[in-house]
Amino acid sequence: MPEELRNMIEREAMRLIDERRKAQKMTIDDLARKLYPDKPLPAARMMIQRLRTAQGSKPPRKMNLGEYVELTRAVGLEPSATLTVIMQNFDETRI
């Protein structure tokens, strides 16, 4: 799978997670506290932000599978069903 396509899939996952988070009126801080209760809030927030936005000249950090599962569950999404929705947004010939 081309790297560009992997990046697009990850960005779509983050878009759906953010969409659900906002629909629930959950802030980034709320999500950070839920995912990383043992970390100071600024550090927890930064861990999420690195997945969402570019940091300086670097692209957003790649999301690993565990993070994907934690993020989707934290906003009330079912990981496998959400992945199915994400993959339906991409042409099979590109995958």
Predicted feature locations:
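Short, charged recognition helix plus adjacent turn
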Residues: 2-7, 73, 80-95
